[in-house]
Amino acid sequence: MTPPETETETASGEGGETRTLYGSPEELPEPAREALGDLLLVLADTKRVLGIHYADWILGSPTLEAGIACSAMAQDEWGHGRILYAMLDDFGMDPERLEHERGPSEYRSSELLDEPTDSWPELLALNLLLDTALSVQIEAMRESRLEPLHHKVSKILDEERYHFEHARGWTARMASTDRGREATGEPFRKAWRACLRWFGSEEDELASGLAAEGIVDAGPGALRRRWVMRVAPSVAEVEPDLVQETEDGWGSAVAPDWEGWDPRTRRLRDAPGPDDEAILSRVRGDRNRSLLGE
């Protein structure tokens, strides 16, 4: 069988050498292909479950406009998840099974999403910190040498801009009162630590290998710094002890905690997974599939 032809391009910042463009995942070196499949599944699962958390606040939001925003963001995340699940067919995974047939321990969504979101400040922490972390990771694929990935992420990123603006506006609103700042403190501290860790360790060879292959444009440490720079000004309004401003810009005042961390799933190893009844049954669409006889 003749292998698919590939094109070439000149990489910037690397001395002008010619680098191969990959036309499909099958053309990737095996370690990079495996690492990218893991990453896409993490992103797909996290977006799908995050969509449920947004949907839960369509009717319970503080304002009508916020409820409408939650509806739009939920639809966005589900659409993005479907795009990513479909891509995993090229990595030897069954999108139908991924979407509808897995239990809690098989999901790779952030442990921040394992339990229902009980308060608006908790949802706001997910909106500003976790949602933006996903966007920073996906932005790193914008100029990917894997052409199908490069083309798919553009639509996702176009829709994600609104999510950040919504989060930034509501964080400023909460920061305007003592009660608001007090309410956001603990949710932001919890989400900050989880998201800081979510990008992975700079010593993670698989994640760093994706950057070396040009599948993403930066390794875990650089992506974490991008995320901090983006969200820190808003975080400083409600929980200033988490961040610090230096001559070089914003940084985290706390270091990532790697105890119990699984770099492949980007979850804590002892985290149980999303609640099966309250969250996953809806993610999978169990009730609707039962009505349809599936």
Language model segments and positions:
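Acidic/His metal-coordination segments adjacent to aromatic residues that form catalytic metal sites
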Residues: 21-41, 101-127, 144, 177-178, ...
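Internal, conserved structured core segments that host functional sites
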Residues: 113-166
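Helix-loop segments that flank and shape redox-cofactor active sites
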Residues: 50-72, 134-150
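Extended, helix-rich structural scaffolds rather than catalytic motifs
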Residues: 182-294
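Acidic, low-complexity proline/glycine-rich segments
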Residues: 2-23, 44-45, 95-107
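Alpha-helical scaffold segments that form or flank carboxylate-/histidine-based iron centers
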Residues: 34-42, 61-80, 123, 148-160
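Conserved alpha-helical segments that form or flank metal/cofactor-binding pockets of metalloenzymes
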Residues: 3-4, 73-101, 167-172
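Generic structural signal for well-ordered, non-transmembrane alpha-helical segments
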Residues: 45-48, 75-82, 128-132, 154, ...
